[in-house]
Amino acid sequence: MPKCPIPIRISFFSYFLKESRILSSNPVNFSIHLRFSSSVSVSPNPSMEVVENPLEAPISEKMFKSAPKMGSFKLGDSTLSSMIESYANSGDFDSVEKLLSRIRLENRVIIERSFIVVFRAYGKAHLPDKAVDLFHRMVDEFRCKRSVKSFNSVLNVIINEGLYHRGLEFYDYVVNSNMNMNISPNGLSFNLVIKALCKLRFVDRAIEVFRGMPERKCLPDGYTYCTLMDGLCKEERIDEAVLLLDEMQSEGCSPSPVIYNVLIDGLCKKGDLTRVTKLVDNMFLKGCVPNEVTYNTLIHGLCLKGKLDKAVSLLERMVSSKCIPNDVTYGTLINGLVKQRRATDAVRLLSSMEERGYHLNQHIYSVLISGLFKEGKAEEAMSLWRKMAEKGCKPNIVVYSVLVDGLCREGKPNEAKEILNRMIASGCLPNAYTYSSLMKGFFKTGLCEEAVQVWKEMDKTGCSRNKFCYSVLIDGLCGVGRVKEAMMVWSKMLTIGIKPDTVAYSSIIKGLCGIGSMDAALKLYHEMLCQEEPKSQPDVVTYNILLDGLCMQKDISRAVDLLNSMLDRGCDPDVITCNTFLNTLSEKSNSCDKGRSFLEELVVRLLKRQRVSGACTIVEVMLGKYLAPKTSTWAMIVREICKPKKINAAIDKCWRNLCT
């Protein structure tokens, strides 16, 4: 018979049973682990089914507080540890602190495992500071020796919270400081440090730590290699990541599907499908079975390269290998097909998805409907919309907005307005994009008053107007000659604190140019130049509007000055810029020589600034107008293009085009 090291009086058990009857009205399942070879469990009602609630501490502190009145019973250290762990797991940190204070006052001893439980609980509650504070108090206040286990627990809490700099500082303080903590990092410690360094893009420093692990008698594991490969891939250092795979295998560490997925993703983003194929072959040779992440990554890579047919074939292979496609798989494929203007093929894929029992979501429907409208297949888009309703898939704000925008593109704003009304009736409130699309649709069909009415209706649904809404209204009003009203809207926008972007500025400048107010338009242009926001700086559209306005007024001198400013600010002319000046110069002279000379001068100026792309655009315009450049101009173009870097870039572009 096992010997009991602590005498327990019968009076305590009598009290305990009495207490349990009192508590039976509010049943709590608890058990007392005595120092026998087996545990003794006592339940308020033996016939009652045990119900465990992980959010409640399983030990009644009230019971233990009352127990000393009945005899010499004293809580053991193991009981206090259990209570701390219970409070921590239930998130009751106030009780944890109270109990820790009691333990400190009574000079009791708590095992390290209990502290680790509290550290993890602090991590789940996003309280890294409390975890660090308790770690520093372990020895002095609780006489608990810290080991690498508690150190790793706190380090993990800090790094999982995204506090990477703080995590590295904590590591350095514990391991390298003169605090004599006598904690030597292990493999997990190094993995956490490497993770933090890679997240901070200090990949070279992470490699140094990785190379120094054997000196600390720690060998890298699969997680170490995977973390480092991921960091290298994010820095576009794919070759180094692939070399690590070879090194890993030579060290006898078998790569997991996660490692292959990281490398495949990096190679796909680089567009190196040849090496991706070799890597997948290597994966199969090593007996590593691709999972849904592998297939999704490969499909995404094929879609990026425009190889949609191969992506669809890979989907079939995925299904045949009994790997179930998910939302990401189908979403990637359908997005790829729609971007390639193959929405009809995407609809066919949709049918095969349904045959496999896949239930389409709002995202898939919105992408398909948008794609069909952009390809001018409005009837098919509306048919899909009706099918969506038949399938019981409730449209969300994205689906409704896509429908409104698509119908407006087709010149059917009244039908789009009906969709908007149905949207509101269903309890789905339109956003700024929905209203802006409808306003643009009405303006496009000449229904200016209806567009203004939509603007007013935004107040009824409580939709706040953004800079895009104001840009649409200003552009629409200017388009029908109502520039004064547009200026009033502009003033209101500035008054309420909305900073106009390039589109808004360009819209009001276009309106002012349309009524011949060039000075006011140029004043706004100079105001744009003073803006700190890059999104408020003039672009080629802004310059073309101003250049056209100046040329319409025959103010060639100021137009040339503005063109010079455009070039100085790094904005290259486009086809519209060239045509604007060619038309103006042709009106002044029937000869084409002035136009050719003007454009050639532009080409030379751009080439001298190494802006080859802009120069080539102008040359294309010249050739389209049968204005062949001089031999000297061609020579400059060839010399600039044939520089080593330019040749390599051209070759890479050529290969990319061949691959697609």
From Swiss-Prot:
It comes from the Eukaryota. PPR repeats lie at residues 76-110, 111-141, 147-181, 186-220, 221-255, 256-290, 291-325, 326-360, 361-395, 396-430, 431-465, 466-500, 501-535, 539-573, 574-609. InterPro entries: Mito_RNA-Proc/Resp (IPR051240), Pentatricopeptide_rpt (IPR002885), TPR-like_helical_dom_sf (IPR011990). GO terms for biological process: embryo development ending in seed dormancy. Pfam families: PPR, PPR_1, PPR_2. Transmembrane segments: none annotated. Keywords: Repeat. PROSITE patterns: PPR. NCBIfam families: PPR. May play a role in embryogenesis. Belongs to the PPR family. P subfamily. This is Pentatricopeptide repeat-containing protein At4g20090.
